[in-house]
């Protein structure tokens, strides 16, 4: 079979396939025989319909169309095998089907053209002399103290206060009512009873906590506050509102002692000393992990920057679908109504928003895989098996696709080995954490965009 290849943009190739005359004749005969067996014509038994009557009943054009569909399917498969081509996704017919019907004659050669996505050709840059800047996360002992403070707050006992005014750190129970500072009229839904106000700066509307400071139980106070411009309720966004606040109860927090009993209540450690040591180790490892991730990310992005590759649309669409699937599962775990978010109208926009991150993710994955291939980096089956065993010991009660799990673990470990190999050859400059934050990643931007709809769903539940 004669096949002419043409390289096309976006990792596509075009194929011009000439079907031999003998094939067009034999396929025509076979299709007609099959039709004769399957078509019911009154007065004739199945398979006994005379050829001429069959053609008259079905029409020459319909028979030709059936033959051409069979020819394209079979000959395309043969051409791909003959040329050693692995197609991604479904090939697209470039020839007009009507033109093929008009040109087709049994016993004469027929030529048709298709385009198809193929794996991209990747040209790596100078990967042995990379120079990158990454953020270093340094372990801060204060993180342990903050952890203790948070747990103490969670386990605090609330004790009624009668002899002083409210102060930061207290819990106030208040009734509130709001009216427009402009018209003096009450505002619907801006009122409530028994609202718990944790007296922490920055909570609720700006100025509310500060206004409550000093109030005592049963005291009533008016304060004028301005809602932020991005407040979900449009009728009060950026508007000044006069609040009438009635202090009903005031409570102080009594924090539990940091002793062995506390350690046993908040962890599986027996003593406070053991818990502190465990936390120190955890936060130290977390700092090391964050530094490693920053280095890996910088190396990967620099590797992609120096590489040349053209992504096929099939892979991009597949990655976009993967991103949306992950978002779907995350929103579901958050308790959001995913059917309200992932609507027929929303999905096209969500796919569009996810596309930049899909492209970036694909490039990073493919370039690292190409480097592993070029540098001869491998991962041992024994290491993969050990990792799988560790995972399965934690997921013993779940139905797992072992073949898929092995593939994912192998790819992850291969990428890990490749980046470790790359680190040894690269020049890496570490800067303090937060120094590079202005360079927001594509992934973060995509997550923020996809989460926007979820925020709207939750907006109605926001506190005043």
UniProtKB/Swiss-Prot annotation:
Enzyme Commission (EC) number: 5.2.1.8
A GO CC term assigned to this protein in UniProt: cytoplasm
Superkingdom, taxonomy of origin: Bacteria
Biological process, per Gene Ontology: 'de novo' cotranslational protein folding; cell division; chaperone-mediated protein folding; protein transport; protein unfolding
One Gene Ontology MF term: peptidyl-prolyl cis-trans isomerase activity
Principal subcellular localization: cytoplasm
Compartments, as annotated in UniProt: Cytoplasm
InterPro entries: PPIase_dom_sf, PPIase_FKBP_dom, Trig_fac, Trigger_fac_C, Trigger_fac_C_sf, Trigger_fac_ribosome-bd_bac, Trigger_fac_ribosome-bd_sf, Trigger_fact/SurA_dom_sf
Listed Gene3D superfamilies: 3.10.50.40, Trigger factor ribosome-binding domain, Trigger factor, C-terminal domain
Residue intervals of the PPIase FKBP-type domain: 169-256
Catalytic activity: [protein]-peptidylproline (omega=180) = [protein]-peptidylproline (omega=0)
Annotated keywords: Cell cycle, Cell division, Chaperone, Cytoplasm, Isomerase, Rotamase
Endpoints of the signal sequence: none
Pfam families referenced in this protein's UniProt entry, alphabetically: FKBP_C, Trigger_C, Trigger_N
Function text: Involved in protein export. Acts as a chaperone by maintaining the newly synthesized protein in an open conformation. Functions as a peptidyl-prolyl cis-trans isomerase.
Family: Belongs to the FKBP-type PPIase family. Tig subfamily.
Domain notes for this protein: Consists of 3 domains; the N-terminus binds the ribosome, the middle domain has PPIase activity, while the C-terminus has intrinsic chaperone activity on its own.
NCBIfam families referenced in this protein's UniProt entry, alphabetically: tig
Protein name: Trigger factor
Lineage: Bacteria, Bacillati, Cyanobacteriota, Cyanophyceae, Oscillatoriophycideae
Primary gene name: tig
């Amino acid at each position: 079979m004669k096949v002419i290849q043409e390289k096309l943009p976006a990792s596509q190739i075009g194929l011009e396939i000439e079907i031999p005359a003998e094939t067009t004749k034999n396929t025509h005969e076979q299709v007609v025989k099959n039709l004769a067996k399957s078509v019911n014509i009154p007065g004739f038994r199945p398979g006994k319909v005379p050829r001429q009557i069959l053609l008259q009943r079905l029409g020459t054009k319909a028979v030709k169309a059936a033959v051409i569909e069979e020819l394209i399917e079979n000959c395309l498969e043969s051409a791909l095998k003959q040329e050693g081509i692995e197609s991604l996704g479904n090939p697209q017919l470039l020839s007009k089907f009507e033109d093929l019907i008009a040109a087709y004659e049994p016993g004469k050669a027929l030529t048709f053209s298709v385009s198809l996505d193929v794996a991209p050709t990747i040209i790596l840059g100078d990967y042995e002399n990379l120079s990158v800047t990454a953020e270093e996360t340094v372990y801060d002992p204060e993180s342990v103290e903050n952890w203790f403070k948070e747990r103490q707050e969670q386990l605090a006992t609330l004790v009624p206060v009668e002899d002083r005014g409210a102060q930061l750190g207290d819990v106030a129970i208040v009734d509130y009512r709001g009216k427009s500072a402009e018209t003096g009229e009450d505002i619907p839904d801006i009122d409530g009873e028994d609202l718990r106000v944790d007296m922490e700066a920055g909570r609720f509307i700006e100025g509310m906590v500060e206004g409550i400071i000093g109030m005592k139980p049963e005291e009533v106070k008016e304060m004028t506050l301005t809602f932020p411009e991005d407040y979900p309720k449009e009728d009060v966004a950026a508007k000044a509102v006069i609040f009438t606040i009635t202090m009903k109860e005031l409570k102080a927090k009594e924090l539990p002692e940091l002793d062995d009993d506390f350690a046993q209540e908040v962890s599986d450690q027996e003593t406070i000393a053991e818990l502190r040591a465990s936390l120190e180790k955890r936060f130290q490892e977390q700092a090391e992990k964050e530094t490693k991730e920053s280095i890996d990310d910088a190396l990967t992005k620099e590797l992609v920057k120096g590489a040349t590759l053209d992504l096929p649309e099939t892979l991009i669409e597949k990655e976009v679908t993967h991103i949306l699937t992950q978002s779907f599962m995350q929103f579901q775990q958050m308790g959001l109504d995913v059917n309200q978010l992932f609507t027929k109208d929303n999905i096209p926009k969500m796919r569009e928003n996810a596309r930049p991150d899909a492209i970036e993710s694909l490039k990073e994955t493919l370039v690292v895989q190409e480097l592993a291939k070029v540098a001869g980096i491998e991962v041992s089956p024994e290491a993969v098996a050990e990792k799988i065993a560790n995972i399965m010991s934690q997921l013993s009660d779940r139905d797992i696709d072992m073949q898929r799990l092995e593939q994912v673990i192998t790819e992850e470990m291969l990428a890990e080995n490749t980046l470790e190999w790359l680190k040894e050859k690269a020049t890496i400059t570490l800067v303090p954490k937060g120094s590079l934050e202005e360079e927001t990643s594509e992934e973060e931007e995509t997550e923020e965009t996809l989460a926007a709809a979820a925020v709207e769903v939750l907006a109605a539940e926001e506190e005043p």
